[in-house]
Amino acid sequence: MHKYAAIDIGSNAVRLLLAVIAEPAQNPIKITWARMPIRLGEDAFLLGRISDEKANQLKNTINGFKYLIEAFQPLDFMACATAAMRTADNGQEICHKIFQETGISIDIIDGRQEASFLFKNKPKDLFSEKEACLLIDVGGGSTEMTLFYQGRRIASESFNIGAIRLFKKQADPLIWEAVEHWVKDNTAGYNSIVAIGSGGNINKLFRLAKGKKGKPVSCKTLTSIYKLLRQLSIDQRIKQFRLRPDRADVIVPASEIYLKIMQWSGCRNIHVPMLGLSDGMIRVLHERRSGIFFY
C-alpha cells in the first residue's frame, strides 16, 4: 500500500489530497480531500502581487495541511502552485517564507508542466483508441489543454485565460483568438473527438446537470445551464443552486470557456471524471517511486 499526499495551490482555492495506490498500476484511491477558499488570483491578476493578508492565509493553510500530512505518513508528497503564483511578482518570495516557517517546499510550475500533470489523469475507459481525446482544464487563471490520440500525446498548451481572469475582466482580448486557432488547428482532421473536463467548475456543472458516472454531458445541456446561471445574480445562484460564494461568481465565465472550446473542436459531449491537478500529482509521485508509468 503506497501513500501519497499532494497540495494544489490554485488561483481560487488551495487543495490537499491524501491518497493510496494498492497495486503498481492501480488508480489512486482518495482517502481525504480538503479545500480552503483562498482567492490568490484576485490579488495576482489585479495587483500583480499577493497581499500580505492572502500570503498569511496561505501560510496558515499550508501549516494546517502539514499536520494532516504528518499524521497520514505518506511515502512522498508534493506541493505545486499554478497561475496566480506564476503571475505574482512576489510568488517566489512567498514560497520561500512558507518553506522557512513550515518546511513545506512549493514548486511554482509553468503551464506546460501543469498540463503534463493533468495528462496523467487520462481515463482510458471513457474513449476508444480510434477517437482523439481533448483534455480541458479551466482554472482560475489559466486553461490547459492536451490532445491525445492512440495513447500518445499529440499537442499540449496553456493559455492565460481562466474563470477569475474573465470575471475580473483581466484576460487579454486577443487570447480568445489564440485559443480558437490552437483548438481548430490541432483538432482538424479527426473524425471523432472526445472532450474530458477537469476543474472545480466543470465538476459543479456536471452535478447541476445531474450527470451520471461514466456518462458524458451534452454541449446542449451545458449551454442550457449556462444560460440559466447567466440570468441570475450571484446571490440568486447561491440560494437557488446552493453554490459556494467563491463558485457562484466564476462558474459562468468558466462555462463560457468550456463551451467555446467544445464548439471550436466539434465536441458534442464532455466527460467529467471528477479529477484535477492533485490527482495527476499523486500519479506523478507514484511513477517516480515505482518506475511504473500511467501514461
Regions found by a protein language model. Give the residues of each.
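N-terminal basic/disordered segments at the start of proteins
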Residues: 2-29
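Conserved ATP-binding subdomain of kinase catalytic cores across diverse folds
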Residues: 25-44, 70
